[in-house]
C-alpha cells in the first residue's frame, strides 16, 4: 500500500474535522475534506488503513463499486488512498478513540486508548460496524490452537488454501464468493450450509450451482458441522450431520468458517448518541443527535439505508459537505466540480514548477 503519513507530533494542533475510522468511508471522507479545503485527521484502530477490506479479505474481489467491474479489496483501498494522499491528511493508526467531549467553544476533544488527545472543530464517525469478531461453532469446543493454521474465519491470502482440501461453512455472500474464488487454488472444495437454500447474491449462487453440477464443488445443504477429527497439529476430517440425522465424514485440511461476524460499537455505544440496531441515527445531512458530530457508512442509520461500500462513499461526501456549516458558520458554501478544482490545482503546480 502507498506509504501513509502517520501523525506522531504533539496532539495540540486544532484541525477542522476528526474522522474516526479509516476504512473506505473514512479515507474517502478525508479526500472530500481536501476537495472542500478543510483540514482533517483520520484515527484508525487497526495498524493500517482499509478497515475490513484490508484486515479480513484483502484478496476478495468486489463487483459493486461504480467504475470498477471487478477489483480486489486491497486494491480498492490503495486506489482510495492514492486519490486522497495528495491532500496529506494526518493519519493516526493503532489507536482507538474511547471518548469525546464537546468544549465550551463548540469544538470537540477525543481521547484514545493510547492516551492521545486531539481537538477539532467537528467530528465524523466512520467506524463501520465497530469492533467485530467472527462467529464460531460452539460444538467444536476450544479450537484456538488450530485458528490461523487449519481453521480460518476469513481469506487473507489464497496461498493458505493452495492445494488443500477445504470445507467452507456458510450460505451468505462470503461463503459463496470463496467457494467460487478458491476453485483452481484448493485441491477440493466442500460447501456446507445449514439451510435449504443460499442467502448470498443470486449470480454467485448460480455459479456455485454450476460448479456443483460440473463436479468441481461438493455442496451439502440442510447440513451442519458436528465435529472435527484432528491429526497432529492440524485437522484430518470434518464430520457433518444432516437434518435427517444422517452423518458423513469429509476429509479436509482446512476448515473455513464464513458464518458472519458479531459487531460491537464499543465505547461509541456509551457516547449518548441516538442508536438503532447497533447504528447511529443521522438526519438527511448525516448529522447525529449531537450538533457538529456526523456519521457515515455502515455506522450511520437512516430510512432506506443500504449497507454497501458505494453508499458509504456517498455518505462521506454528504457528511463532509454539511459539516462545513458547523466548521465555518456564516460562510457561503460554494460547490466546485472536481474537474474544475483539479484543473486549477494542476495549473498552479505547473506555474510553480
Curated annotation (Swiss-Prot):
Superkingdom in the source lineage: Bacteria
Binding site for FAD: 25, 44, 52, 57, 97, 132, 298, 339
Note on how the cofactor is bound: Binds 1 FAD per subunit.
Cofactor names: FAD
Keywords assigned by UniProt, alphabetized: FAD, Flavoprotein, NADP, Oxidoreductase
Gene Ontology MF annotations: ferredoxin-NADP+ reductase activity; flavin adenine dinucleotide binding; NADP binding
Pfam family, one: Pyr_redox_2
Catalytic reaction annotation: 2 reduced [2Fe-2S]-[ferredoxin] + NADP(+) + H(+) = 2 oxidized [2Fe-2S]-[ferredoxin] + NADPH
E.C. numbers: 1.18.1.2
InterPro entries hit by this protein: FAD/NAD-bd_sf, FAD/NAD-binding_dom, Fd--NADP_Rdtase_type_2, Ferredoxin-NADP_redctase_2
Assembly and interaction partners: Homodimer.
Similarity-based family: Belongs to the ferredoxin--NADP reductase type 2 family.
Protein name stated in the entry: Ferredoxin--NADP reductase
Amino acid at each position: 500500500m502507498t506509504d501513509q503519513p502517520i501523525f506522531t507530533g504533539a496532539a495540540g494542533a486544532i484541525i477542522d474535522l476528526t474522522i474516526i475510522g479509516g476504512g473506505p468511508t473514512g479515507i474517502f471522507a478525508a479526500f472530500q475534506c481536501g476537495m472542500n479545503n478543510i483540514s482533517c485527521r483520520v484515527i484508525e484502530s487497526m495498524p493500517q488503513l482499509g478497515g475490513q477490506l484490508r484486515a479480513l479479505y484483502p484478496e476478495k474481489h468486489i463487483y459493486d463499486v461504480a467504475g470498477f467491474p471487478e477489483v480486489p479489496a486491497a486494491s480498492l483501498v490503495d486506489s482510495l488512498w492514492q486519490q486522497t494522499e495528495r491532500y496529506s491528511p494526518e493519519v493516526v493508526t493503532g489507536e482507538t478513540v474511547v471518548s469525546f467531549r464537546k468544549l465550551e467553544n463548540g469544538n470537540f476533544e477525543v481521547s484514545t486508548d493510547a492516551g492521545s488527545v486531539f481537538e477539532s472543530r467537528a467530528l465524523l464517525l466512520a467506524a463501520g460496524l465497530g469492533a467485530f469478531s467472527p462467529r464460531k461453532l460452539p460444538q467444536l469446543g476450544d479450537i484456538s490452537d488450530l485458528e490461523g493454521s487449519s481453521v480460518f474465519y476469513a481469506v487473507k491470502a489464497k496461498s493458505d488454501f493452495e492445494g488443500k482440501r477445504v470445507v467452507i461453512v456458510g450460505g451468505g455472500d462470503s461463503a459463496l464468493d470463496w467457494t467460487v474464488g478458491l476453485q483452481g487454488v484448493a485441491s477440493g472444495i466442500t460447501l456446507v450450509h445449514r439451510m435449504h437454500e443460499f442467502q448470498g447474491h443470486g449470480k454467485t449462487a448460480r455459479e456455485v450451482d454450476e460448479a456443483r453440477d460440473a463436479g468441481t464443488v461438493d455442496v451439502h445443504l440442510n447440513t451442519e458441522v458436528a465435529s472435527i477429527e484432528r491429526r497432529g497439529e492440524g485437522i484430518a476430517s470434518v464430520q457433518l450431520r444432516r437434518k435427517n440425522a444422517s452423518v458423513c465424514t469429509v476429509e479436509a485440511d482446512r476448515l473455513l468458517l464464513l458464518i458472519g461476524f458479531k459487531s460491537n460499537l464499543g465505547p461509541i455505544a456509551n457516547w449518548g448518541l441516538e442508536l438503532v440496531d447497533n447504528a447511529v441515527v443521522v438526519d438527511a445531512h448525516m448529522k447525529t443527535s449531537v450538533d457538529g458530530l456526523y456519521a457515515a457508512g455502515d455506522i450511520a442509520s437512516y430510512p432506506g439505508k443500504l449497507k454497501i461500500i458505494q453508499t458509504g462513499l456517498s455518505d462521506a461526501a454528504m457528511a463532509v459537505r454539511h459539516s462545513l456549516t458547523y466548521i465555518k458558520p456564516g460562510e457561503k458554501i460554494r460547490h466546485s466540480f472536481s474537474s474544475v478544482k483539479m484543473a486549477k490545482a494542476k495549473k498552479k503546480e505547473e506555474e510553480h514548477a
